[in-house]
A protein has these predicted regions:
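Core segments of transmembrane alpha-helices
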Residues: 689-690, 754-766
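Membrane-water interface at loop-to-transmembrane-helix junctions
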Residues: 742-760, 789-799
Length: 894
């Protein structure tokens, strides 16, 4: 059946539904079970085996596999040794690959959970009730309501259209919105079908309602939609890497190149040192190669990228628990350096619970009737509550108190046409027919805009001409209400006799109207917002209010919240239009409130802040907010009142539409970035210590650690504390710091120098432990015998492994604060303590069980353990001293 060639009644009949009542809940559930959810089929996922082997494409893993192959060759060649190294290396490679697969799976699960949290919703009529359901639960035959800002959730035949326009570029490539209607289409001569773009009585999945509203019946879902039919041609953009992840990838590649160069130098040094002796000496070649591999293993922080990704994912999950749903990982990093927050007023800074508290009219009944008739909110007689957009719900509630319910008004004055609200006119009009047959237009909107289109006024004595004196009085009443932080709406009407207007275009309707009255509503400030604004200010973040409300209302609320101190810091959209770009660039830092703004004003405000180098966040809920949200560094959509389009382009969605949530998210962003820096510094300083130790030992001529030892330390000893750092609470004063510069790299703030100093100290402790271990065994620090007989160095190697493992465990506690003393931290990280204990146990297991033979360790006693513990623990006072020196240096610079 081609629904666009059939009448609406025939389509309703074919789908076995009812245009007014919709499907029953039971029938909808049955159809959902029979035909499946309303979503496109997902691309088949790679098998676990394929993912597993994909992990081995890493250059580091390839190098380890080569080392394993050479060790195996050595075992076969000599008939002894080597095999244990092969087993350990392969075990580590397998574990690394398994962890990689698990981590990818966790990331996919997290993404799926986030997608579910921000899933699109649809308004549907079932059993005669208006309900909101997940778009994936829609079935053929559902009656849905569409309005400006909605993404069309399924293919549907339009039943009613009130000036509805739909943008279908996702299907047709044409960005100009198409005006929709409910009339039956007919084929042109010599044609057998109508192109998709000309089917004006249809709406298709993936298109966007940009104007007006409508009612439609679903005729296709999921893969049966037009979008589903071309699903193979649709490519969904994958989540890109964050700047931090890109930087880490570059760091890994740089380290890999450096390692190859250093390893080649070590190999070349061996040839120079041993000369012709090395040629044909497989053992010598092998030992030199293993030193090179050791350097490679030591230099590459194998778990760094995975750890950082997990830290980000954990942060995103934590943010969602605080009602901030992050849709793009880049937002996590950017939140930590946000400098300007451009916030909408209604619902974000205020509670979005409007209540009419004041009227200015000489005909209250006519005024409240007009307000209710000109609203799309409905009054639920059973629950005695209004449902719909908050402002309209307040007006409908006000009318119901006087006995005018929406159901009674709809039956006595049915709507026959309308000019929907849009942000440029700031008003909407409906045309109704009374029981006596008269056609009356009712208009509501911004007082100044409505008043400008009126020529008469309704008084207690009847309708008279609207004089300049009366206009001035109305504007004074409007200002009086606005000064009390009331949102003011005006009503007007126009009689059309018995004939309906030929056109419902706003230009035809909204002129020569009769002014009826004003209603003042209060939307209370959210109690937590004032403190959040103050906290943002202390954290170096500027709050800017951008609203469509009257400037007096905006100023009153902004002053109450501490956003501005007086009216001189506020301007209107009209005033902004008169300011040149150069002047605005100079004045923007003095402006805290923008009132009566248009969508293009928001884009200009964001662009100007960004040109000044300020990291800017922008909130929004309407479809017209999408351009400014996309332009901002952080686009923030509203989860409750936001349209699908706005949420779709946002980097972050506020599940509770609360400004305070933005500040919480910024704090969380700072905490996450701090913890990532701690992980990076911990892992890089540890790896640098290993490189220095192995390199110095190779120059002297002894082996301090084998590749398998370093792999164990990097993947077990280091990774557990690094992951535990992801749970570290925010340091005291984190929201008293200025935002970080987004251009700062990983090593900004002295991280690179810190890594060098800390790595050098750890390396010295490790080298010292080797000599101490040798002394415990042979009673001398002279290791000349080790150079000629590597077997004599087992005790020193065991001591070096134990000390390096333990010193890195202790060093993880130093990383709880990069500059502050850890003894001044008031919180405890139980996960870090847990990782410390677990790493300690695993280290003892490797040394004190039969595993020690595979690793080539010697038996050591209590004295060695005590000395290793003493050396390892010394890293804490040494780092405390270093931090104190650095704090003093920074203080002197300041």
């Amino acid at each position: 059946m081609k629904e666009y060639l059939s009448s609406a009644a025939d389509v309703i009949s074919a789908q076995k539904t009812d245009a007014e009542v919709g499907l029953s809940d039971a029938e909808a559930a049955s159809r959902l079970e029979a035909h499946g959810p309303n979503k496109l089929k997902e691309a088949p996922k790679e098998s676990i085996i394929k993912r597993f082997f994909a992990q081995m494409a890493d250059p580091m893993v390839i190098m380890l596999l080569v080392a394993a192959a050479i060790s195996a060759a050595e075992g076969i060649y000599t008939g002894e040794g080597g095999i244990a190294d092969v087993v350990i290396i392969l075990f580590v490679v397998v574990i690394n690959s398994v962890l990689g697969v698990v981590q990818e799976g966790k990331a996919e699960e997290a993404l799926a959970a986030l997608q579910e949290m921000s899933a699109a919703q649809s308004k549907v009529i079932r059993d005669g009730r208006l309900e909101t359901v997940a778009s994936t639960e829609l079935v053929v035959g559902d009656i849905i309501l569409l309005e400006a800002g909605d993404s069309v959730p399924a293919d549907c035949r339009i039943l009613e259209s009130a000036s509805m326009k739909v943008e279908e570029s996702a299907l047709t490539g044409e960005s100009v919105p198409v005006e929709k209607h409910a009339e039956t289409l007919s084929l042109a001569e010599d044609t057998d079908d109508i192109p998709l773009g000309d089917r004006k009585n249809m709406c298709y999945s993936g298109s966007i309602v940009v104007y007006g509203r409508g009612r439609a019946v679903v005729v296709a879902t999921g893969m049966d939609t037009e979008m589903g039919k071309i699903a193979d041609a649709i490519s969904q953009a994958e989540e890109g890497q964050t700047p931090l992840q890109i930087a880490l990838d570059k760091l890994s590649h740089t380290l890999t190149i450096l390692v190859v160069v250093i390893s080649l130098l070590v190999f070349a040094t061996g040839f120079i040192k041993h000369g012709a002796e090395m040629l044909g000496n497989f053992d010598l070649i092998l030992s030199t190669f293993m030193v090179a591999v050791s350097l490679a293993v030591a230099a590459i922080p194998e778990g760094l990228v995975a750890v950082v990704t997990i830290v980000l994912a954990m942060g995103v999950t934590r943010m969602s628990e605080r009602h901030a749903i992050v849709r793009r990982l880049t937002a996590v990093e950017t939140l930590g350096c946000t400098q300007v927050i451009c916030s909408d007023k209604t619902g974000t800074l205020t509670q979005n619970k409007m209540t009419v508290v004041r009227h200015e009219t000489e005909n209250l009944d006519a005024h409240v009737r007009t307000m209710a008739l000109c609203s799309d909110a409905t009054w639920d007689d059973a629950e005695q509550v209004a449902k719909g957009e908050p402002t309209e719900a307040a007006l409908v509630t006000d009318a119901a108190k006087l006995g005018y319910t929406t159901s009674d008004l709809a039956s006595s004055r049915p709507r026959i046409g309308e000019a929907p609200f849009d942000s440029s006119r700031k008003m909407m009009s409906v045309v109704v027919r009374t029981r006596s047959g008269k056609v009356v237009q009712h208009t509501k909107g911004a007082p100044d805009e409505v008043l400008a289109r009126c020529t008469k006024i309704m008084t207690s004595d009847g309708i008279i001409d609207l004089t300049d004196e009366a206009r001035s009085e109305i504007l004074a009443q409007n200002k009086s209400m606005a000064d009390q932080a009331l949102r003011v709406m005006a009503s007007a009407r126009r009689d059309w006799g018995t004939e309906a207007p030929q056109s419902y275009d706003p230009a035809n309707l909204e002129h020569d109207m009769v002014f009826v009255g004003l209603s003042g509503m209060i939307d209370p400030v959210r109690p937590e917002v004032k403190g959040a604004v103050a906290e943002a200010h202390e954290a170096g973040m500027r709050t800017v209010m951008i609203t469509g409300d009257h400037i007096d209302t905006a100023v009153a609320i902004a002053v109450e919240l501490g956003i501005i101190t007086d009216r001189s810091q506020a301007i209107t959209g009209a005033q902004l239009d008169k300011i040149s770009d150069e002047e605005f660039d100079q004045r923007i830092e003095t402006i805290g409130v923008y009132a009566r703004v248009q969508p293009e004003h928001k884009v200009r405000i964001v662009d100007t802040w960004r040109k000044k180098g300020m990291v800017t966040a922008m909130t929004g809920d309407g479809v017209n907010d999408a351009p400014s949200i996309k332009r901002a560094d952080i686009g923030i959509g509203m989860g409750i009142t936001g349209t699908d389009v706005t949420k779709g382009v946002a980097d972050m969605v506020l599940a509770d539409d609360n400004f305070a949530t933005i500040i919480s998210a910024c704090e969380e962003g700072r905490r996450i970035y701090d913890n990532i820096r701690k992980c990076i510094q911990f892992l890089l300083s540890s790896n640098l210590a290993e490189v220095i130790s192995v390199f110095i030992a190779s120059l002297v001529g002894f082996t301090i650690l084998q590749p398998t030892h370093l792999l164990w330390i990097n993947l077990i000893t280091d990774s557990l504390p690094a992951l535990a750092m992801a749970t570290e609470k925010a340091e005291p004063g984190i929201m008293k710091r200025k935002p970080r510069n987004p251009k700062d790299g990983i090593f900004a703030g002295g991280v690179g120098f810190d890594c060098l100093v800390q790595g050098s100290i750890i390396a010295l402790l490790t080298l010292a432990s080797y000599f101490i271990g040798h002394y415990f065994e042979y009673g001398t620090f002279d290791i000349s015998q080790v150079i000629t007989n590597p077997e004599a160095g087992v005790e020193g190697m065991t001591m070096a492994f134990l000390t390096l493992s333990m010193v890195e465990m202790f060093h993880s506690f130093n990383m709880r604060s990069l500059r502050g003393s850890i003894f001044k931290l008031t919180s405890q990280n139980i996960w870090l303590w847990g990782s410390f204990v677990m790493s300690l146990i695993l280290t003892f297991v490797v040394i004190e069980t039969p595993l020690s033979q595979a690793f080539g360790f010697a038996e050591i006693g209590f004295e060695e353990y005590a000395m290793a513990m003493l050396l390892a623990a010394s890293i804490i006072p040494l780092m405390e001293l270093y931090k104190a020196v650095m704090r003093s240096v920074q203080k002197n610079k300041a």
